[in-house]
């Protein structure tokens, strides 16, 4: 996103060697190959589509801000041995993939996480006004950045499509209504006035 690029340049954290989709697939294939002996259920032997499935899974985990440690913790709460194994193997694949990527590349799927880490350490946007337009909802990864911006910027504005005559439970407005509730809660927790 433009905000990521701006903050990265402002703070000297620009990414030079960004991984592309083709290279992501190669690195995932290498990660699965490296783990062949350790994987019981998610083995890549004879399963060419596993690379695509695991790339999508890693992407979904990052967007949802679910860490491999959280997957491992969840596996301890599960009685089903197959699910427990899948959670642990997914965590192992994710860790191995990230380790291989980090040796040579910057993963753009981590940009929002990197941005939020910068915002938490250094309030570089404290005198800025940020306007969000055209969003009805946010991923968890995006929400972490949004919360930092609500807390740190001099003003943050959001345009959401809501029907003032309903409670927002209608399907058409449900996502925007849920987003509004989340944003309102963030502002309340961080002592930010809502106008």
Regions found by a protein language model. Give the residues of each.
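Conserved P-loop NTPase-based nucleic-acid remodeling module centered on helicase motor cores
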Residues: 1-73, 81
């Amino acid at each position: 996103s433009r905000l990521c690029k701006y903050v990265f340049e402002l703070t000297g954290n620009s990414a030079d060697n960004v991984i592309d989709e083709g290279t992501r697939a190669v690195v995932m294939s290498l990660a699965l190959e490296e783990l062949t002996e350790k994987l019981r259920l998610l083995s890549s032997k004879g399963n060419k589509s596993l690379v695509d499935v695991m790339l999508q899974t890693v992407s979904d985990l990052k967007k949802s801000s679910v860490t491999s440690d959280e997957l491992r913790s969840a596996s301890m709460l599960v009685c089903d041995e197959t699910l427990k194994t899948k959670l642990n193997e997914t965590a192992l694949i994710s860790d191995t993939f990230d380790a291989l990527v980090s040796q040579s590349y910057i993963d753009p799927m981590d940009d929002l996480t990197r941005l939020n880490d910068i915002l938490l350490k250094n309030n570089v946007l404290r005198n800025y006004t940020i306007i969000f337009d055209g969003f009805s909802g946010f991923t968890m990864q995006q929400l972490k950045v949004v919360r930092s911006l609500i807390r740190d910027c001099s003003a943050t504005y959001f345009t959401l499509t809501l029907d003032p005559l309903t409670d927002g439970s209608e399907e058409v407005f449900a996502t925007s209504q849920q987003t509004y509730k989340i944003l309102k809660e963030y502002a309340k927790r961080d002592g930010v006035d809502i106008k």
